[in-house]
């Protein structure tokens, strides 16, 4: 049983990450995933280049005005800056909360479906001194959309796993981010996306409560409700906002301190535009609505840097500008010039 002080710290950390419209930078890509992004731009996928890219992100002056938390990959906890300062220390000095990606990826579950794995040694990893600077964590499950998929069994299994991860994190003093991602690829309609998103989120809340997760000490990382990439259905930011907020209001209780959106294959302009439109919607809600973006924040940085140190200053300028826009979107003030 977690005592009141323990629960209070969890709740305060969750709120601090998203205070004043701040959001989360998802820098938790594996070396393999980051390597694919490097390859497209002619950057060699070495440990040194990955370290240097992360240092560019974390050392950007003023980034703490817009970013309240950064999710890291395990490799990053072992890396230092060019001057020998641990990369985690760069973030701590800016008052940015440090997160750790804890799922171990996905495995096959029935036909065309996946479940996330990593629970078997999660408690030990949460206790590891290697991650002593982390105050929050993230775990991702992925839902594919085909005929009859995701199945009810898959939804239940993934949501149960997310809830078990969440309670283990909380017992170890980490604020859990639970991420039930809806895969953007597919030809599904916005209506189907809305219906299944509601089913997933309501099931997630059921299991979080079943596992006795402290609701004010958890954050939800959600997908925007859109049609699939292969669908011919068109949508505007206003329509995305209406369907997404409706799904959230129907499923997420007031105790949740915040919901952050993943870009999930949407470009930076769309991802931030959707966030802004949602925050402009009227609705009786108590939770913060912000962002937890990876590529939407860093694609421009990577394209500008391209492994050339002479481009670092310009790359950091782009990160700052994009983060500022995302922060304005989290306040529903993207187009407010005042």
UniProtKB/Swiss-Prot annotation:
Catalytic residues (UniProt): 179, 221
Protein name (database record): Fructose-bisphosphate aldolase
EC number, as in UniProt: 4.1.2.13
EC main group: lyase
The organism's place on the tree of life at top rank: Eukaryota
Record-level Gene Ontology MF annotations: fructose-bisphosphate aldolase activity
A biological process term (GO) from this entry: glycolytic process
Keyword Lyase applies: yes
The protein's annotated pathway: Carbohydrate degradation; glycolysis; D-glyceraldehyde 3-phosphate and glycerone phosphate from D-glucose: step 4/4
